């Protein structure tokens, strides 16, 4: 799968920036559609996500732990979380995952995540968490 970082509406700079790190293109599109109050930037892997962090400094990040090359595990997602917080330590990261939810939630919060959301994604619930940030 090619690396991507896609802006939903780059011409509107008044909206807060939300970085969605998710390797499922369908879920990326759904989140872009659901969060019109934000300028949504989507990244599908760690490399593109960290490039966006350096360039755009998003206000909020949602992070799926199951990213390539380890989509069935959590190692790449946690490495991405650590990279995000190394670049911008005060970034509010909401981790969303279905992998070992309780253990992953504890680890994510211990590493500095703002919150944890267990998949499958409910757009309204995740939107509420993102809006709290």
Question: What are the language-model segments listed below?
Answer:
Residues 42-60, 64-68:
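Acidic, metal-coordinating helix/loop segments flanking the phosphotransfer/catalytic sites
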Residues 103, 121-130:
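C-terminal output helix
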Residues 51, 71-90:
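Short amphipathic alpha-helix used as the core "switch/output" element in two-component signaling
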Residues 13, 24-47:
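Two-component/phosphorelay signaling modules centered on CheY-like receiver
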Residues 99-100:
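Short, conserved "switch-loop" micro-motifs in signal-transduction and mechanochemical regulators
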């Amino acid at each position: 799968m090619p690396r991507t970082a896609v802006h939903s509406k780059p011409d509107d700079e008044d909206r807060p920036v939300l970085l969605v790190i998710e390797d499922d293109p369908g879920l990326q599109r759904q989140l872009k559609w659901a969060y019109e109050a934000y300028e949504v930037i989507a990244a599908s892997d760690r490399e593109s996500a960290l490039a966006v962090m350096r360039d755009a400094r998003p206000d909020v990040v949602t992070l799926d732990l199951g990213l390539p090359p380890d989509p069935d595990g959590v190692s790449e997602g946690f490495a991405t979380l650590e990279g995000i917080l190394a670049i911008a330590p005060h970034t509010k990261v909401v981790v969303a995952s279905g992998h070992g939810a309780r253990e992953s939630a504890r680890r994510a919060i211990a590493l500095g995540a703002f919150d944890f959301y267990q998949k499958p994604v409910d757009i309204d619930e995740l939107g509420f968490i993102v809006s709290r940030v």
